[in-house]
């Protein structure tokens, strides 16, 4: 995928990978900004129920407006590729920060409050995050 252009998104790097798919950094060549693209794996995209769930989750997440939750810009399909276009967040993944060494109590409390606040915002809209991890 690296170096490939899909629709008007030029893929520049891979950010992560999980059970549902792969996330890439890309340039939105129409708007001139960097975004994250979350691709549903081809095997899962062939399952109508999983594809519908992927799309439902993107629509639900798009209803959220919170500083600690990335903004969903859209759902796209190109040929057999299904993906979500999201805000690209700048910063360090929590898992990487944890690997660097112990966090002091003030940092732990600050992070915990931010995470709890984001989850409360989602829960207030009936959304339950089923895959919490420090990434």
Where are these regions (language model features)?
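Conserved ATP-binding/catalytic core of the eukaryotic-like protein kinase fold
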Residues: 1-135
């Amino acid at each position: 995928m690296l170096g490939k252009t899909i629709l008007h998104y030029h893929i520049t790097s891979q950010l992560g990978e999980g059970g549902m798919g792969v996330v890439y950094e890309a340039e939105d060549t129409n708007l001139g900004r960097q975004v994250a693209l979350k691709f549903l794996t081809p095997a899962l995209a062939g399952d109508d129920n999983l594809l519908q769930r992927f799309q439902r989750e993107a629509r639900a997440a798009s209803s959220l407006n919170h500083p600690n939750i990335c903004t969903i810009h859209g759902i796209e399909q190109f040929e057999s590729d299904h993906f979500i276009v999201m805000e690209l967040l700048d910063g360090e993944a929590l898992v990487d920060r944890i690997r660097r060494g112990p966090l002091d109590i003030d940092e732990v409390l600050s992070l915990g409050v931010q995470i709890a606040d984001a989850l409360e915002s989602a829960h207030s809209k009936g959304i339950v995050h089923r895959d919490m991890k420090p990434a």
